[in-house]
């Protein structure tokens, strides 16, 4: 089920003539109580505040903050898990630093949090421009940061001797400028005997070790996990519940639906809007699953707009928990963090940026400074972030400037991620006319602009002011709302083929929008039709759907093409580009595939199964062993064919940055050499180098005239594993 915003009054779509019209639901109606069923829980609306606030702080703080160590590029909060892996860097580090008799639970007692100042934390979050935070109430180590009556494995009975969650929530809810406060909660615990059925052991001696503070219960979920979740909900009234560890078991094991229904109903009775992350798992719990209120990609950003609400989480460096082994160069710069926030918001996402406090409760100075830099930028430019929504498209593709768009009622914001110089070039489809006023936030003076020979809007910029990213505010007198158009039309069509879909026209603002006339233009020789030529006036949040059908000529050249959707609303006329690519057949679908090695039971065949889902939890991505030298994946097309190129779908979760600096090769003969240099320079091999991180998809073109039966993708990295969501080899059969 598609997630909907509480702002939206839509309850259904009815056919009126050839036009589908959204029927509004009165705000005053009291929604029914939620039932512990998938259908009922998935009908819960995304809170308005969550969609408006855009920026939150994630906090990973636990006993793992005592050793505060992990290999570069790893998660320090997974210290205990890595420590129990013989031969791992963490296993070796622990033995060398603490000795083989030192157990992980020693850190629980050593954790004092003696410098923890919740008021200071909250002030920092506010100064950073964040509107909410999510505290790790319990990570996979099992240490609860609240006074749990279910388990003595908490920060009141062990370590700090304080209810850390209570103190932070109280600080956040002081005064008028309150922060929304949420809990992360790990459903499973690595070594809880009540979950695993066995006592944890010393990884060096094999001797059993205690699991401090936790009771032994008969049913981990019924007697331990669910009661703890209810403690958090009933005792702390969180605004967000954010689960993790859901991948371990199916939804039928976790049984979270009852707790979530009670949480929603409690909020309903109290007139409160709350949100639950999809990892709380009532269906698949995959990071991109539309279940519950929002998706949760990790160290990944959607490649384009996703109308289903999502929130990307990541650390300032790679680890969520504090990792003293991460040097400054492993941390994102303030410029990169601002750019990431802008990019995410333009695609209908929120950014949940993690900090890892030290064991004593202080926040590392480097992390503090990054947050303050973001806050300084948001103080000037926040109107382009808070309370905005996505536009027709997220960015300017193919233009000279790297720009992201957001919209609020009748105002369009164009944010340049880099200073554009004397002129900023924007698309020809912008909603502007002769009276449009363009200013730069932080400057305020009206800027002159014109259209170039291609119809693009060219803005003459003021002297550079500010830092990180530059927001240009575009307003037209009398235009109170800007409509948004999205299309379900397929992104590709075969020569001579026909594709159909729907065009959705939405008023995302807070005021009524006037009627709109529609036209559709297509390249010469194409056929394109709309199911209606007019959209009636739309109230706030209303949408209409218009059928659309497109047929490509049989002799069309495989290339990207563009349809033009013309819209006239009042005196404003705009043309929106609808991209459609003509592709040759996918020759690799279902063909035999191999890879250098296989890790995590993820075979090479997954990359030719027709499923482009890039999330690991979906079970459709490949994976080699880890680490692996110059990892490769290859496919046998069955026969030689003229090849146009290869579309590669990257991972969309934690590991997208691994697929870069790679080669795509084609050959008439099988590849027989594991060495990259020898493989790509072998006789008859055509090889194309890709330096940047692959997209989803990323298209790699072969030189004209390339033929081949075998196609290989190979990393240059001496250690990174290769993981692919899908590979489509395009050519003529």
Q: What residues fall within each predicted segment?
A:
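Asparagine-centered strand-capping/turn motif at beta-strand->loop junctions
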Residues: 505-509
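Terminal connector regions
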Residues: 555-583
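Secretory targeting and sorting signals
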Residues: 1-28
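Short proline/glycine- and polar residue-rich coil/turn motifs
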Residues: 136, 451-453, 462-464, 493, ...
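Short, surface-exposed loop/turn segments at beta-strand-coil junctions that are enriched for proline
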Residues: 464, 551-557
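Short acidic/proline- and small/hydrophobic-mixed sequence motifs that coincide with surface turns
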Residues: 510-516, 659
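Aromatic, loop-rich ligand-recognition surfaces of beta-strand-rich domains
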Residues: 430, 471, 476, 584-587, ...
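Mature catalytic domains of secreted/periplasmic carbohydrate-active enzymes
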Residues: 29-483, 647, 689, 716
